[in-house]
């Protein structure tokens, strides 16, 4: 007992994680490695700031700059045709979501019983019309591309060499000969 009194072990407060402040709790959790579950030996052994993790994981989370997203794979700037094709692809992919939203609005309209929602979304049975419009737009775009090709060839049909060959080796030969 005399040793206990000289070291004053009775007055030492034991650590209770429930009584810890939120900052101390966070600091206590941050000292453990998320992969191994072990405590860090040194606070300088690995980056604990969120900025370092963001820099490491930035591309995996899809954080790209606008300049990178506007460049094609080979680093070339995006042409107007490429931009339009991308927009057309986005319209095509969002068609299903648009139709679902329109369906939800028409069900709201039936519950509401007023004509205001019909004025917002247009004709109530136009879901098939919207998909038909997308198909018409694609057909018109292919016709416009054919017309541009005709203009480039001064009103003549495209030459036989521009037709797609049957085999890949013939296609590669055609490419090599055109250079």
Curated annotation (Swiss-Prot):
Position of sequence motif LXXLL motif: 172-176
GO cellular component: kinetochore; nucleoplasm
Entry superkingdom: Eukaryota
Stretch forming the signal peptide: none
Any single GO BP term: cell division
Membrane-crossing residue ranges in chain numbering: none
InterPro entries: CENP-R
Localisation: Nucleus; Chromosome, Centromere; Chromosome, Centromere, Kinetochore
Keywords: Activator, Cell cycle, Cell division, Centromere, Chromosome, Kinetochore, Mitosis, Nucleus, Repressor, Transcription, Transcription regulation
Pfam families linked: CENP-R
Polar residues bias: start-end ranges: 30-50
Start-end of Basic and acidic residues biased regions: 51-64
Location of region: Disordered: 1-79
Domain topic, free-text comment: Contains one Leu-Xaa-Xaa-Leu-Leu (LXXLL) motif, a motif known to be important for the association with nuclear receptors.
Functional note: Transcription coregulator that can have both coactivator and corepressor functions. Involved in the coactivation of nuclear receptors for retinoid X (RXRs) and thyroid hormone (TRs) in a ligand-dependent fashion. Probable component of a centromeric complex involved in assembly of kinetochore proteins, mitotic progression and chromosome segregation.
Name of this protein: Centromere protein R
Native source organism of the sequence: Gallus gallus (Chicken)
Gene name of the record: CENPR
């Amino acid at each position: 007992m005399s040793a206990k009194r000289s070291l004053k072990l009775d007055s030492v407060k034991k650590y209770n994680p429930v009584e810890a402040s939120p900052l101390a709790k966070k600091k206590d959790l941050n000292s453990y490695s998320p992969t191994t579950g072990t405590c860090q030996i040194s606070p300088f052994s690995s980056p604990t700031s969120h900025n370092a993790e963001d820099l490491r994981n930035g591309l995996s989370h899809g954080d790209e700059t606008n300049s990178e997203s506007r460049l094609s794979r080979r680093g070339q700037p995006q042409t107007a045709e490429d931009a339009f094709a991308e927009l057309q692809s986005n319209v095509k992919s969002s068609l299903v979501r648009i139709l679902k939203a329109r369906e939800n609005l028409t069900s709201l309209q039936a519950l509401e019983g007023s004509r205001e929602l019909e004025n917002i979304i247009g004709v109530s049975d136009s879901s098939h019309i919207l998909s038909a419009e997308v198909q018409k737009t694609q057909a018109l775009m292919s016709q416009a591309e054919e017309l541009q090709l005709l203009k480039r060839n001064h009103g003549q049909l495209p030459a036989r060499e521009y037709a797609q060959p049957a085999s890949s080796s013939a296609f590669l030969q055609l490419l090599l000969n055109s250079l």
